[in-house]
A protein has these predicted regions:
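Beta-propeller and closely related beta-pinwheel folds
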Residues: 1-132, 147-173
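Conserved, well-structured core segments that form or line functional sites
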Residues: 134-137
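Short, intrinsically disordered, charge-balanced linker/junction segments flanking boundaries
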Residues: 178-181
Length: 181
C-alpha cells in the first residue's frame, strides 16, 4: 500500500472494525452520512469523524450500526432504504438512516410473510422499480417471490408466483417508460 511519512491525503486507507471477532465484508454502500459496510455479522458506518465529512488516512471512524449480518445477495437501494439479505439467509432487512438517533436502523421486512422465508435462502433478486415498485426474488427451491415495496406510502407485501416450472435466476431490463421483468 502507498503510505507516506508524514501521512498524505491521497495515501492508502486502512481501518480496523473493532468487533472482537472476525467479520467478512459483504458489501459497501455510499450514503450521505458515510459509507455503510455490511459484514457477515453486523453493519458499520464509516465516516471521516463526523457525518458527511471526507474519509482519509488520518480521518476515519467506524461505528457499528446493527448486529444483523448480510449474506452474499447484493443490496438493493430504494430511495433512502437499503434492502439486504440476512447472513442466515432466511430474512430480508430494510435499513435506513435515522437522523434523530444518527444511526442506521433496520427492520425485518420478511417477517410479515415469514412462511415464505423459513428455511429458504435467496440466490438472486432484481429490482423492477417502475412502474409497480416490485422486487423479484428467486428462492433456493425454484419458487419466485415478488415484493411490492412502497415505503413512502407505508405499503409492502410479499407474494409467491405459482408456475409449472422452477426459477433459477431473474433479471430486470430498463426500458423507456418501465422496467421489464
Amino acid at each position: 500500500y502507498n503510505v507516506s511519512s508524514p501521512i498524505q491525503a491521497d495515501d492508502a486507507i486502512s481501518v480496523t472494525l473493532a468487533s472482537g471477532q472476525l467479520e467478512t465484508i459483504k458489501s459497501i454502500i455510499p450514503t450521505a452520512p458515510g459509507l455503510i459496510v455490511y459484514t457477515d455479522k453486523s453493519s458499520w458506518m464509516v465516516t471521516g469523524g463526523s457525518l458527511g465529512s471526507a474519509i482519509g488516512p488520518s480521518a476515519i471512524v467506524a461505528q457499528r450500526q446493527s448486529l444483523v449480518g448480510a449474506n452474499d445477495l447484493p443490496p438493493i437501494i430504494r430511495n433512502f432504504d437499503i434492502l439486504y439479505g440476512s447472513y442466515l439467509g432466511s430474512s430480508i432487512w430494510d435499513s435506513n438512516y435515522n437522523y434523530y438517533a444518527q444511526i442506521f436502523t433496520g427492520s425485518d421486512v420478511s417477517e410479515i410473510s415469514s412462511h415464505l422465508f423459513y428455511d429458504f435462502s435467496f440466490p438472486q433478486w432484481a429490482d423492477a422499480f417502475a412502474p409497480f415498485r416490485l422486487i423479484w426474488a428467486v428462492r433456493n427451491d425454484g419458487v419466485l417471490l415478488s415484493f411490492t415495496f412502497a415505503k413512502e406510502e407505508q405499503f409492502m407485501a410479499w407474494s409467491h408466483c405459482i408456475t409449472a416450472g422452477n426459477f433459477t435466476s431473474v433479471a430486470v431490463v430498463p426500458e423507456a417508460t418501465a422496467d421489464s421483468e
